[in-house]
UniProtKB/Swiss-Prot annotation:
<dbReference type="GO" id="GO:0004479">
    <property type="term" value="F:methionyl-tRNA formyltransferase activity"/>
</dbReference>
<keyword id="KW-0648">Protein biosynthesis</keyword>
<dbReference type="InterPro" id="IPR037022">
    <property type="entry name" value="Formyl_trans_C_sf"/>
</dbReference>
<dbReference type="Pfam" id="PF02911">
    <property type="entry name" value="Formyl_trans_C"/>
</dbReference>
<dbReference type="InterPro" id="IPR036477">
    <property type="entry name" value="Formyl_transf_N_sf"/>
</dbReference>
<dbReference type="InterPro" id="IPR041711">
    <property type="entry name" value="Met-tRNA-FMT_N"/>
</dbReference>
<dbReference type="InterPro" id="IPR002376">
    <property type="entry name" value="Formyl_transf_N"/>
</dbReference>
<dbReference type="InterPro" id="IPR044135">
    <property type="entry name" value="Met-tRNA-FMT_C"/>
</dbReference>
<protein>
    <recommendedName>
        <fullName>Methionyl-tRNA formyltransferase</fullName>
        <ecNumber>2.1.2.9</ecNumber>
    </recommendedName>
</protein>
<dbReference type="GO" id="GO:0071951">
    <property type="term" value="P:conversion of methionyl-tRNA to N-formyl-methionyl-tRNA"/>
</dbReference>
<dbReference type="GO" id="GO:0005829">
    <property type="term" value="C:cytosol"/>
</dbReference>
<dbReference type="Pfam" id="PF00551">
    <property type="entry name" value="Formyl_trans_N"/>
</dbReference>
<comment type="function">
    <text>Attaches a formyl group to the free amino group of methionyl-tRNA(fMet). The formyl group appears to play a dual role in the initiator identity of N-formylmethionyl-tRNA by promoting its recognition by IF2 and preventing the misappropriation of this tRNA by the elongation apparatus.</text>
</comment>
<comment type="similarity">
    <text>Belongs to the Fmt family.</text>
</comment>
<feature type="binding site">
    <location>
        <begin position="111"/>
        <end position="114"/>
    </location>
    <ligand>
        <name>(6S)-5,6,7,8-tetrahydrofolate</name>
    </ligand>
</feature>
<dbReference type="InterPro" id="IPR005794">
    <property type="entry name" value="Fmt"/>
</dbReference>
<keyword id="KW-0808">Transferase</keyword>
Length: 314
């Protein structure tokens, strides 16, 4: 079985699926990805990770600013592909595009739908304290992640998983599950599952201000925040008026009478801060213009300011 496929994706999450399709018996006719944009401190124009893979494999690359344009839609239809595979593309597909393929448009989504529809399912799952997430392969419709589900594969969320950890695991699971689903879809050997609207939750886009730590929250909630916002936008607090990023932190199973934000202790185990309930121990930190450092190195550099019983952060 060899399907003619149009692939649409942009970030690193989409790369394993594109690679899997390239290495399979299927034919990738073209790759749609978002236009090159300025990125980083120097605002250098960068191509997407998906574009890089397509270029390396000499696959035609198409980068429209929108697919609402009639000319772009006709171009898509003219490819006469069997199916469109969409993985974190970032552009809305109009009805004409959704109906342009014999087997429809199939999406790889990083949650167990209908939980966490939307832009940030990985981060929202960690923030909510979910114990599992996964991949859903979905037949796209005009709604936001509301289409019928072709397949699901669950993945445990450990107490130490960051968004980066889950991102990498789920991207690989998604690639494998997509190939399995395409084979069944072509044979007609697949049962579509309607989503339960009553169980739907929405994973709104992460805003930078969400990364600011409120020490009145519980240590458990703040630890989730640190994990969910690694590698971006990185949870942060303030130290001597400067934003201080926290890359790694753990919950200490102890009680304290200190007020939220007060330093409990600072030693080789880490820097322990009282939260609304419980204690959060900081292990990896970063001040502006500096490299990420261990708590031990931070103590060596700023130990004179780390006085137990004082409000040092926040």
């Amino acid at each position: 079985m060899s399907l003619k496929i149009v692939f649409a994706g942009t970030p690193q999450f989409a790369v394993p699926t594109l690679r899997a399709l390239i290495d399979s018996s299927h034919r990738v006719l073209a790759v749609y990805t978002q236009p090159d944009r300025p990125s980083g401190r120097g605002q250098k124009i960068m191509e997407s990770p998906v574009k890089e893979i397509a270029r390396q494999n000499e696959i035609p690359i198409i980068q429209p600013f929108s697919l609402r344009d009639e000319v772009e839609q006709e171009k898509l239809i003219a490819m006469n592909a069997d199916v469109m595979v969409v993985v974190a593309y970032g552009l809305i597909l109009p009805k004409k595009a959704l109906n342009a393929f014999r087997l429809g448009c199939v999406n790889v989504h990083a949650s167990l739908l209908p939980r966490w529809r939307g832009a940030a399912p990985i981060q929202r799952a960690i923030l909510a304290g979910d114990r599992e997430t996964g991949i859903s392969i979905m037949q796209m419709n005009e709604g936001l992640d509301t289409g019928d589900v072709l397949a699901k594969s669950a993945c445990v969320i450990s107490s130490e998983d960051t968004a980066a950890d889950l991102h990498d695991r789920l991207s690989l699971i998604g690639a494998d599950l997509l190939l399995e689903s395409l084979a069944k879809l072509e044979k007609g050997d697949i049962k579509l599952e309607k989503q339960d609207e009553a169980s739907a939750t929405y994973a709104s886009k992460i805003q930078k201000q969400e990364a600011l730590i409120d020490w009145r929250k519980s240590a458990v909630e703040i630890a989730r925040q640190v994990r969910a916002f690694n590698p971006t936008p990185i949870a942060f607090t303030y130290f001597e008026g400067q934003p201080m990023r926290i890359w790694r932190a753990t919950v200490v199973d102890e009680k304290t009478d200190f007020e939220p934000g007060v330093l409990v202790d600072a030693d080789k185990k880490g820097i322990s801060i009282a939260a609304g309930s419980g204690i959060l121990r900081l292990h990896q930190l970063q001040l502006p213009g500096k490299r990420v450092c261990s708590a031990g190195d931070f103590i060596n550099a700023h130990g004179d300011k780390l006085i137990p019983g004082k409000t040092v952060f926040g």
